[in-house]
Amino acid sequence: MVYSKYMWSVKGYENQKLFLDNAFVNNKLAHAYLFTGSDRETKKQLAIEFATMILGVSEEEKERINPDLIVIDQSKMKIEEMRALISELSLKPFRYQKKVAIIQNFEDVTDEAASSILKTLEEPNNSSLIILLSRNQKSLLPTIVSRCQSIYFNIHFILLIFNCW
């Protein structure tokens, strides 16, 4: 088995981590990623670690507030909040080369909010990257799914691995 080059704190999901590593190392980052699956906490942790890798955040800086990393963790995100995020992503990064936005529970955003981010996904800004987290991509607009690089996280596979030990 080939292992990731980055020192991820999350155990398991070696193929997903290797895929993200390769995209980063080869400068082939997508403008948007969709992390799907039932393992909510792991998706969030991997998204944050991937974002800090992209930004080049040092170990000492990880605990500090970072204006170039936006993590939204709320249900039923409304169109006004999505527009504010889109506006923030259109601004130049404060410290790093990119701004990264992570939106958790994307399946719970309002239809209007989901539609409003579509233009940003269709016409990406080179200085921003979006990571959407969702339990099931079938609950999302197909046009949003088609604009993102999808990565699936299956908790049952990880539980199977741990049960084999």
Mark where each language-model region is.
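Short glycine/proline-centered loop/turn elements that form peptide/ligand docking sites
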Residues: 78, 115, 135-137
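Conserved catalytic/switch belt of AAA+ P-loop NTPases
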Residues: 90, 115-132
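Long, charge-dense, solvent-exposed interaction surfaces that engage phosphate-rich ligands
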Residues: 129-135, 139-165
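Conserved adenine-binding aromatic site and its adjacent loop/helix in ATP-hydrolyzing domains
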Residues: 87, 119, 146
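Conserved D-loop-proximal element of ABC-family nucleotide-binding domains
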Residues: 111-112, 142
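P-loop/Walker A NTP-binding region and its immediately flanking N-terminal helices
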Residues: 1-103, 129-131, 142
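Conserved Walker B
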Residues: 105-109, 137
